[in-house]
C-alpha cells in the first residue's frame, strides 16, 4: 500500500467534487479504498460525493421530465390549433403577465383559451382564464356582466346594450375590426380567416351600442 497514493487520490477526489465532476470524484475515492479499505476520511468523502451526486441527478431527471411534459403539451396544443385551422402567432420577446395558458381537454377534444375582454371607453378589462371554444360570446358576457363592475355603477354594460368586436389581421399585417354577435361561438371567431390568436391570448373589445362621439372617434381609428 502506498500512503502517498491514497492521499493524492483523496485530494483529487475533493478537488473533483468541488468542480462537480462527481463520477470522477467517486472513481478516485474507490481507487483509494482499494489501497486502504479502512480509511474513514475517504469513506466519508465517498458517501458525501455519492449523496450529492444522487441529489443532483434527481433534480436533473425531474427537470428533464418537466421539460418533456412542456414540449409534449406544446405539440398537443399546436396540433389542436392546426386541426381546427386556427391561425396563431407569437410576438418576439413577449412575456405574459398572467400564468394562464391554452388548455386542451383531450377527452372532450375542447380548447379553452385565456381571453381578455377590453373596455376602451373606461380603460378597463377582464381576463377570462379559460374561455371554452364551444361557449358563445353572449354566454361569456352574461357571466361577466351579471353584476355591475366597479367602473360601471349604473350597470350600463350588459350583453344586450353592448357591441363586441375582435381585431382582424390580413396577410399583410393590416389591422381591422369585425363585429361579432352574441350567439356566435368562440370557436367561430378563432377559425375566422382573418383572426390571429396572438401569444396564446384571445382578445375582444366591448363598447356601448349607443352612438356617442367617443364611439365615433374610437371607430375612426380603425377606419370605420
Regions found by a protein language model. Name each.
Residues 78-192:
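Non-catalytic interaction/regulatory modules that flank or connect domains
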Residues 49-83, 87-89:
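Alpha-helical linker/edge segments of TPR/alpha-solenoid repeat scaffolds
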Residues 12, 24, 96, 121, ...:
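Intrinsically disordered, low-complexity regions enriched in small/polar residues
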Residues 1-63:
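Alpha-helical protein-protein interaction scaffolds
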Residues 169-224:
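C-terminal interaction modules of eukaryotic adaptor/scaffold proteins
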Residues 57, 128-130, 219:
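Surface-exposed beta-strand edges and their flanking turn/coil or helix-capping segments
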Amino acid at each position: 500500500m502506498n500512503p502517498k497514493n491514497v492521499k493524492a487520490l483523496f485530494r483529487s477526489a475533493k478537488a473533483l467534487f468541488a468542480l462537480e465532476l462527481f463520477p470522477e470524484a467517486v472513481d478516485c475515492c474507490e481507487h483509494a479504498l482499494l489501497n486502504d479499505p479502512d480509511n474513514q476520511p475517504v469513506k466519508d468523502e465517498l458517501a458525501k460525493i455519492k449523496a450529492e451526486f444522487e441529489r443532483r441527478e434527481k433534480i436533473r431527471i425531474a427537470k428533464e421530465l418537466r421539460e418533456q411534459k412542456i414540449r409534449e403539451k406544446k405539440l398537443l396544443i399546436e396540433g389542436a390549433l392546426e386541426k381546427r385551422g386556427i391561425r396563431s402567432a407569437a410576438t418576439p420577446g413577449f412575456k405574459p403577465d398572467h400564468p394562464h395558458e391554452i388548455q386542451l381537454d383531450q377527452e372532450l377534444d375542447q380548447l379553452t383559451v385565456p381571453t381578455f375582454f377590453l373596455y376602451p371607453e373606461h380603460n378597463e378589462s377582464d381576463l377570462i382564464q379559460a374561455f371554452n371554444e364551444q361557449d358563445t360570446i353572449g354566454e361569456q358576457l352574461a357571466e361577466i356582466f351579471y353584476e355591475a363592475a366597479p367602473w360601471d355603477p349604473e350597470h350600463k354594460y350588459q350583453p344586450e346594450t353592448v357591441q363586441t368586436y375582435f381585431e382582424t389581421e390580413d396577410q399583410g399585417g393590416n389591422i381591422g375590426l369585425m363585429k361579432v354577435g352574441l350567439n356566435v361561438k368562440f370557436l367561430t371567431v378563432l377559425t375566422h380567416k382573418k383572426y390571429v390568436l396572438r401569444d396564446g391570448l384571445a382578445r375582444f373589445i366591448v363598447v356601448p351600442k349607443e352612438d356617442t362621439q367617443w364611439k365615433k372617434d374610437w371607430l375612426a381609428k380603425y377606419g370605420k
